[in-house]
């Protein structure tokens, strides 16, 4: 699952991954959350952090409130805007779950492979 409010970024990410993964795309976190609430639980979510309505951190927290701890996250960002988002980015970077824009396709694949192989116990809320 890819969640990004920028259509161009969303399309590029999907194209980079569609040959290797089953990709679903959402332009906002609320729509992605609604899909997950209906039982469409992905193995991994690639999400922008800075999005209107619901940012990546709030999206992450809502997924965890649903009790979905098996879904892994890889966050992408152009840089923190608030102190709260900076702290969240630091936590995700420490876990190897953050990719800074701009990035190349091979960097995305490497980060995604690393995310998929990390143990769920490494989630910061545990």
Segments predicted by a language model, with ranges:
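Receiver (REC) domain active-site loop signature in two-component systems and cognate sites
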Residues: 51
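Conserved phosphotransfer cores of two-component systems
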Residues: 37-40, 62-71, 91-93
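Two-component/phosphorelay signaling modules centered on CheY-like receiver
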Residues: 7-24, 93
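Active-site residues of response regulator receiver
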Residues: 48
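C-terminal output helix
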Residues: 100-112, 120
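Acidic, metal-coordinating helix/loop segments flanking the phosphotransfer/catalytic sites
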Residues: 25-44
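Hydrophobic/aromatic residues positioned on beta-strands within the core alpha/beta folds
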Residues: 76-78
């Amino acid at each position: 699952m890819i969640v990004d409010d920028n259509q161009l970024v969303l399309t590029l990410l999907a194209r980079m991954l569609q040959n290797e993964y089953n990709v679903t795309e959402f332009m906002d976190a609320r729509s992605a959350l609604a899909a997950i609430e209906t039982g469409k639980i992905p193995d991994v979510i690639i999400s922008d952090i800075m999005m209107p309505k619901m940012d990546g951190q709030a999206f992450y927290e809502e997924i965890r409130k649903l009790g979905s701890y098996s879904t892994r996250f890889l966050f992408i960002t152009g840089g923190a805007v608030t102190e709260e988002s900076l702290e969240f980015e630091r936590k995700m970077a420490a876990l190897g779950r953050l990719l800074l824009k701009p990035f190349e396709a091979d960097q995305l694949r490497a980060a995604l492979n690393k995310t998929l192989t990390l143990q769920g116990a490494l989630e910061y809320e545990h």
